Amino acid sequence: MNEQVIVQRDPHEPLKTDKREKNWAQHAELIAALVSGALILAGWLLSGYQVLSIILFLLAFVIGGFAKAKEGIEETLESKTLNVELLMIFAAIGSALIGYWAEGAILIFIFSLSGALETYTMNKSSRDLTSLMQLEPEEATLMVNGETKRVPVSDLQAGDMIVIKPGERVAADGIIESGSTSLDESALTGESMPVEKNTGDTVFTGTVNRNGSLTVRVTKANEDSLFRKIIKLVESAQNSVSPAQAFIERFENAYVKGVLIAVALLLFVPHFALGWSWSETFYRAMVFMVVASPCALVASIMPAALSLISNGARNGMLVKGSVFLEQLGSVQMIAFDKTGTVTKGQPAVETIRIAEGFSEAEVLEAVYAIETQSSHPLAQAITAYAESRGVNQSGYISIEETSGFGVMAEVSGAKWKVGKAGFIGEEMAAQFMKQTASDVIQSGHTIVFVKKDDQIAGCIALKDQIRPEAKEVMEELNRLGIKTAMLTGDHEDTAQAIAKEAGMTTVVAECLPDQKVNEIKRLKEEFGTIAMVGDGINDAPALKAADVGIAMGGGTDVALETADMVLMKNDLKKLVNMCRLSRKMNRIIKQNIVFSLAVICLLICANFLQAMELPFGVIGHEGSTILVILNGLRLLK
């Protein structure tokens, strides 16, 4: 019924708005509806003065119906299709033609009031976006040659040094060069707890510096900041149309044509077929045009979807479109990547087992030389452990990395391999574990084997703690009837131990990154609609293969680009909440559609039985539209 208005602005222009002008524009439709209602009341009170009351009703027609008539005519001319706005205007004019001035005016009044309510939903979503945009600073304190000056944030470039004082908002994405503080990142993550930041940490535009003074090196220009990408994502979500909404919009044109054809037939057929008088025939045709209009049906989806998108954005759950909310509401299985999703993504070495004939120092020195060349989380944990044991850097060496398996390099003339059992030899690894470390793999450790030439030199056992909320989340999902699966490259025993601790129902172990897509496809065949939760980096193809890809973003650019939804704060509880709300949205949409169709059928039947007068038809029809919109607004909270 309403075209959505999204707030957009040039990234190089400061945010300055006249609040009074903006408020007036946002409430113009409601004000017009209320004025129309006041004129109707005045016309009713002065009904003894026929000419004066008709003039007042006419004014109510014009003031209350102008916006809708303009919208309907413009849409018809632009798209060459009929719409519900035109149908309601025709119905109001028809009511006036048969002498029902008050009823026609009331129809316009309630129609404009329901339109104002729908506009409120859309404006609420846009206001949430505007509120987010208002958090972006207009100026920054730029440091040049030891001196500072205020400059527009649009002038900042990568490499610039800026100063962030206590109480100020961070003006650009960057890295702290000096200083420490706590930042309020609630604008991005929805999490109110301050986050401690020190030298070398990343900061984002729009977050609030709580106490210490910071010097930050800008890493991205203003238009490329995470803040900007979030705004674009929310704008895209607001502009998106779900399949159900697209169907309703296509259906609207055909339905309106059908109603107008039916009205044309009803102007003549009942008179000749049923013996109705001409006045009764015309009257019933006008009542039919009022009650058969699909206003409530058209408003069944959009207010609910926009309300939930707005709700999610306020609480750190970004959605790229209402279509993904519909799909999340029907998800039967959610697959989780293990590292950084089910677990914290911070593995640590817990124990090291050395084979006979090797020393721990020899093994750690070789492993350290190799793993310092890798960026894998396990490699970083191993190098940190080696450093804590006093191992020093032995210089750069060339490594050969096999993705998902391990790393090979030549150290001091010997050929060393560091990686999974399959990388160094399954049988050799199994025999070593049986003899030396059978207890380790049973307790959920990730095992990294070390091989020198043709002998196993030892193994390193690492463990990543599961997220504290993981078990509770899996239980909640199970109560919702949603199955859970964990996809991991770990050994079967390790994967099973972690899955058992987290309370997950299905485990796919020893799954390489390129195999996750096939596993997602298999799970889709088995369970139907599938969601995939990951970090958005090494599992991007799997996120795309799922019906709904959800990234534990922590505010990363990659997560925003690869996933359909992003958990800005790595809290799995928000996922459960969004699953509940998505299901609630689907229920509300179904309720709205069934209710609106039932009301239309009931009113049409009552009209043909001559058991309903026009005023009751107006109230029943427009009242159902208002109830449908109010039902959708429940998702704002």
Curated annotation (Swiss-Prot):
Domain of life: Bacteria
Active site location: D337 (4-aspartylphosphate intermediate)
EC numbers on record: 7.2.2.20
The organism's taxonomic lineage, starting at the top: Bacteria, Bacillati, Bacillota, Bacilli, Bacillales
Annotated Mg(2+) binding sites: D535, D539
Free-text disruption phenotype from the record: Disruption results in low transformability, which can be rescued by the addition of excess zinc.
Gene3D superfamilies with a match to the protein in the record: Calcium-transporting ATPase, cytoplasmic domain N (3.40.1110.10), Calcium-transporting ATPase, cytoplasmic transduction domain A (2.70.150.10), HAD superfamily/HAD-like (3.40.50.1000)
Matches recorded under InterPro entries: ATPase_P-typ_cyto_dom_N (IPR023299), ATPase_P-typ_P_site (IPR018303), ATPase_P-typ_TM_dom_sf (IPR023298), ATPase_P-typ_transduc_dom_A_sf (IPR008250), Cation_Transport_ATPase (IPR051949), HAD-like_sf (IPR036412), HAD_sf (IPR023214), P-typ_ATPase_IB (IPR027256)
Main subcellular location of this protein, as a coarse class: membrane
Compartment(s): Cell membrane
Name recorded for this polypeptide: Zinc-transporting ATPase
Record's function text: Couples the hydrolysis of ATP with the transport of zinc into the cell. Plays an important role in protecting cells against oxidative stress. ZosA-mediated zinc transport is required for post-transcriptional control of comK and competence development.
Membrane topology: Multi-pass membrane protein
Induction data: By hydrogen peroxide. Repressed by PerR.
Transmembrane feature ranges: 43-63, 89-109, 258-278, 286-306, 599-619
Keywords from the named record: ATP-binding, Cell membrane, Ion transport, Magnesium, Membrane, Metal-binding, Nucleotide-binding, Phosphoprotein, Translocase, Transmembrane, Transmembrane helix, Transport, Zinc, Zinc transport
PANTHER family on file: CADMIUM_ZINC-TRANSPORTING ATPASE HMA1, CHLOROPLASTIC-RELATED, PROBABLE CADMIUM/ZINC-TRANSPORTING ATPASE HMA1
Catalysed reactions, as listed in the record: Zn(2+)(out) + ATP(in) + H2O(in) = Zn(2+)(in) + ADP(in) + phosphate(in) + H(+)(in)
GO cellular component assignments: plasma membrane
Annotated GO MF terms: ABC-type zinc transporter activity; ATP binding; ATP hydrolysis activity; metal ion binding
Organism of derivation: Bacillus subtilis (strain 168)
Protein family according to the UniProt entry: Belongs to the cation transport ATPase (P-type) (TC 3.A.3) family. Type IB subfamily.
